[in-house]
Amino acid sequence: MKCAKHPSTISMKLTSVPELPYKKGLLNSSPKPKEKHNAKSKYGKNESMVLRSPPTGESIVRFALPIPLSKTKDKISADEMVRRITTNLKMVVSNLEDTYGACYDNGEKAAEKSEAEGLSIGDDVSSFLLCCSQFTSQLEEAVKEECGALESLYKWFQQQVNQMEEISKDQSNLEELQSDGKTASLNIVQIAKLARKFEDFKSRLKTRKEVMQTKNEDKEIMAETLKHYGLMEKQIEEFITSHSALESQTETESQSGTPSVTTRMARMIKIFENQSTMLEKALNDQQTIESKYKQLETDFQMLIMEKTLLEAEIRRLREIERVKSAAKEEQTKKSGKSEKKKFKEKEKNLSPNREFKSIEELLQIQKEAELLKTEKKTLQGQLKWALEEAERNKTQLEFVLHQKMEMFKEESKTKVGQSQNKSKVKIEDSKDSLPKKSDTQLGGQRKDQISSDQSKRPKKKQLADIDPSAVEDFPPETFKSFTVMPLIEEHRESISSQPKEEMAKASEQSEAEDIEGPLEIPSESSNEDDDLLPEDESPMMEQVTDVGRYKSIYISAEPIDTMSLISRTQSEMETLEAINYDNVLNEGEEQDKKIGKDSDTGRKSKRKRSSKIRKLSTHEEESDIVHYEEATKAKVPSKKRASDPYGDEAYESRGSVSKAQTYTKKQGTHQRGRGSASDAYGDEAYESRGSISKAQTYTRKQGTHQRGRGSVQEEESDTVHYEEVTRAKVPSKKQASDPYGDEAYESQGSVSKAHTHTKKQGTHQRGRGSVHEEESDTMNYEVPRKSKISSRRKGFALPITHQVEMHSSESQGSISKSNTETKKQGTHKRGRDSDADGARTPVSQGSDSKADTERKKHRSKEESTISKDSIPVLDEVQDKTFEHQESGLRLEVQAKKLTFSSQNIHNEESATDIKVEYQNVPSSSQVQLKKQKPLGGEIFTTHFVVPAESHAQLYQTHTPETQIERGTTSGTARLTTIPVEHPKKEASPDNLFPEKKLYITRAPTQTKKQYPPWDAKAETQKKTVKEVQGISEPQTKLNPTMSGIILHLDMDRVVETDLENLEETIVPHVLRSELEIGTDAKNMPETPTSREAVRTEAKGNQDVTISIAKGMKLIGKLKDQHGLSSFASKDTISPGKSLIKSSRDNQDDSLLETKPQENTSDKYHPSKTFPTKVINMLPFSEKSLGSTSANVDVAPKPVYRASRGRSRISKALQQLLKTSEHLKPTSTKNQNADLEKHLYISVRSANKHTQKDKKHGQSNNQKLKKQGALSSTKKQKHKEQPKTETIVENNDKFDDNLMMTTSSPNIKIIKELSKTLNLDGGDIELSDFVFKTASAAKKLENKGPSKTKNLNKESSRDIHILHLTTSAIRTLLLDEEAKIRSLEKKLMKQSTILQKSVSSMKKFMFEEPSRETKMKRKKREKRKIVVKSPHILPITTTQKHTIKEKSEISNLEKPIVRGTDILKKSTSARKKRVLKGKSKSATLPKKCDNFPFDLVRSSSDSSKQEVEEQPKPGNVDKKVSDDSYSPDISTTPTKKHTLKGQSKSRTIYEKGVDLPNNLVLSKSASSIQEFEEQPQPGNVDKKVSDDSYSPDISTSPTKKHTLKGQPKSENSDEKGIKRPNNLHMSASVARKRLLKALSTIP
């Protein structure tokens, strides 16, 4: 309730109000009480309640009625209310009793005294005064009490109102009540009550305030919501109070201020969030605990199983011992019997020997018993060790769970399986070891039995079973200590340690077989060491090196705790960050270096022995060929996905993979025992597509070149690999000269560098028949060459893959090193490195571009060496497969995620198909590269195939440039650093290595630094959107939307920054073009097409398009509209030529929406085409601007402009140009058209001078003074007349009504100008506006009207007439005046419209025809007055012209019937009024309300105002629309003048009061002002464009003049009050300006 504010203001008044009425009553009583009362009532000096009752609707009753007692009880305690009321009542009662009772007693006493004393007069008077004083004192006291009661009531009221207001605002009483210390429940109850009461208040107050009525709907909605606030707040408060954590917050907020419902809801939301987080934590904890519990259960079960297995084994061993003992006993019995017989026979001879033999047997038996005991001990020890291992596993599991709760489920599964397998394998090993020993003693039968027993034993998820044969090599001594078991298990773990995902995928057979091979190795080492291995001693094992992902793991006899950790780290290698990955790569590289060549041969032996070990990573028992095929399948779908929309590319990519397979298979000799060379090739290929592309291109080259590139797929793959190799090449080649974006990717990566190299190399590569094939061939040769050269330099071919691998790994760790190495090893190795690394770091880019020529030079040499080196390269590639065991699987993931259809685009494909493919693919590939994170061990060269030059450039044109600006140079930013292992993680700069970050940050600048030579200017202007525009035309063809958007963005910048400059620059050309249209109209496109064509040029001819920047010069020379020389390249512009280029004009077209369409075509034509001197609004035009400056006093100064963007043309002229183009002129006589042309030219010149005077102060008027303005003006007029003729011929775009004749009354005008030059001060004032004697005016009018007849046809040339000299304009005006005089009656109906353009006429007709008629009449009267003035005498010549024009106007009057109302206010009528007004100038102020023109002002003042006001023409157009008046077109000269100085006249329109000062203006002055006032017709022209009439075309030029000079007048129109200070210019100043304006006319 906002009403409380009113009571607050009222309260100050009402609280003290009631005393004053009593004061006034007391004042009437006696002087003494007055003094007393004044002393007492100083505090209440406000008006009395009686005199000032509260306003209606704000009385206390208004607030008192709606408040029920229940609320008062709530807000103010009942006790307090009762106390206040009782105290107030007691005070009142006591005071009243005292007053009245005392008065009554005193009266009795006085009566008694009077009766007793005899009623003396003095006593009576004194007693009366005393009584009065007592009454007054008592009354004052009563008044005070009443005031106190009223104040208390009002305060209570105000409290109630404020409380209701607070309720209405936030229902925030809750906090206040809390501050009062009340409970939340009571607060809620009160709030509910208050809400109800508040609704009651609303219902009552709605009827009393309109504001409340306007907001009834909102308040009803509020009322509906308030119903729910009670319950809501109850719940909220209960919820908040229930949470102690938030109580402090609620308290602080309640103390600080009343929190809104939103804050409370926010609190609740926070509480819910906290609870949700707690619940989530609890759930997570529960899950973790459950997982732990399950793990413990599994461990417990495993322990139980192990226990049962061990017990079973102990039983078995015991049974075996029993069997052995029984057999021995039997043998001993048998042997004893036989020996007894023999002994009996030979007892005599052999008795000592027999004893000895029996002793030996006993010893043997004892030894065997000891052995059995030791075996028993070993078994017991193994049992203990197994139990300890189980405990260790538990601890490890707990540790793992603690570290990685998230990964726990997966790890728990895998670890449960591992632990079970470990325990089982250990138990089985122990079982197997015992059977081995027993087998050695008892025979092979035991072996079979034990193996059968083991197979029969229960097995749970065993990853591998140890064949007894695998353990046979271990001597029985190794089992005497249980330390051997951890060694074997560790060895098995090290072998089988792999990502748990792969283990899950692995089949039991493959892993069981995999374990066989590794166990042989420890068996050999154990055979070498017959003694038990100590725990610290590590067995002699091969290093299990995984260069791509895995650290080489050495098998050692360390406890299983550490080994399990190692296996876990190996399984977690996938998730390692780039730093860990770098470390792994470095270690792998060091190991590779140590291994050297032996690693390859070792790998061969390993493949024979432990190929299954590596299959643990790949999980395939099949041949390497099958494994490779799977990798290639992963490849194929990846490429397939990348190029599914582009089947050709997909087919290529598949072809490339299959090619590599087939080719490597063809080279079976190189495949050796490795499966297929393509196996290693496939693995490596994904490790780095650069290396793949090398191996593929190399193998393919060996295959395809040896096979002659049999299939297109091979050729395409060759091109792909070549492009991969030459991604750095092709972009460099491509960007310079390809019209089709070959470079797209490379251009993105290294667009700038590529530009320079591209031009140089682009010609070479493009000159070839199918550059794709040749380049692919060259690159395919070069790739093997690179590998060859590197291999040669390193001394052998096989290590090349290691070098490639190490280099690829180094390329991530130290790509810069690899780049330097590649440079050292030659451009070929450099290309190889760039391929293998895929990095194509800026160095590799530049080197690749350089390498192009070098590769071409060495092509023949290297081709010869290709066949030689190709085989070792393949071998190396094959070796690489096993180094990168998981590359196939990784590559599948990457292949799925990498949509690089490595774009092995068919050379045979049409450029268009390639274009379509290429456009979409590069972006996807880039995105995918970004998605990849450089965590994997294998350096994945993101194999951007720059399709041969045709399509790279298609996408190149916009994407590379945009990326250059954005700095997203993916190619330069080392795409290769993104390894295959972590495709899921984005290669964001945060994830990249610091090197990679550096490259990523550098790449944009590097790319920006280099631009194609044709785009040289764009280099300086890096961030201008025009760079993107200027790249190439195909951009618009393929992606018109993108280019259009870019263009519009650029234009938006220009609009924001230099819109005004562009407008100003364009307008002079528009003016010029209007003059020039006649000559070049044939060559010009039509207005609708010209604008679009220009935009297409700006988009399409981007090579030529101007890159617009803030510091750039927008003006350049146009050699051709369609063949645009690069606009930015030309900083300077020759003065005489049209400076605006088509591209800029198109931009300006978009910028200047209102600008006439004709101007766009006109701008392009240089002014030289015109034989006559064109009026150049620009500073340094070849045409003599010497006479164009308006200020004679200022010496001409060269104008040096940093940018052509800012034109010297006034905004009024620009708007005139805008409006004039679309006008539909009415046909009139040719003479009138000529007059209008001259008027237009004169106005333009005057405007030019005004603008130039403001801007540069250049003035060639001095020359005119020396030479005589007459000659210059005559020459210019005569020269301009043919222009008008040409305009008439060529201005197809002009409306027929605007067509103007070439005939000119310029001679008379010139004569009049000469007269004006020679006139005295007073005469000059009149002559400034060219209004000469009435006779001259009549002559001009007589001549003019015939011309005005043609104006109907050529009304569009009113603009050109505006370019006419002021003399021509004056002649027209004078002619019109004479005509108006002769045709006053007719003109009252018709002629006024005739002189105005159709648009202006319509505006005048529709807006204020009656007003215009009145104004025209006044103007006519004033003109008559001016004619009477001595200064008007020279106007006779102009009057003659006007008389001539009258005849023409009479012809115009017929079509102008609709505008007759405006014409009724002809200048003749105005002159009449002026004649009357001379005498009645004093009375004119009264008429000023009707008379809009500042006729009182001298012509010089008006001219000055015109000159000064001209700079505001832009406002004039806007305001001119407001000034539909200026009705008299015959007064157009006055209107023209008024257009210049029209701000005054317009203010007169609005104010009219100001006129009396200006009413004294001479006829010329008034006409000038009227003429100035016409600038409104410019807007009229816009509006009148609807009106086809434009009956007085002469007036339209005058309006245009006013538009040029009108800006001030426009301000006067809109503001009315603001008039230029120059309105009161002296006649001399006005004369000077007019002379300057005349001189400026060419």
Swiss-Prot record:
The keyword Coiled coil applies. The keyword Repeat applies. Residues 279-330 form a coiled coil. LRR repeats lie at residues 161-184, 1310-1333. Exclusively expressed in the testes. Keywords: Coiled coil, Leucine-rich repeat, Repeat. Residues 21-51 are annotated as: Disordered. Oncogene that drives tumor growth via increasing proliteration and cell survival. PANTHER family: COILED-COIL DOMAIN-CONTAINING PROTEIN 7. This is Coiled-coil domain-containing protein 7A.
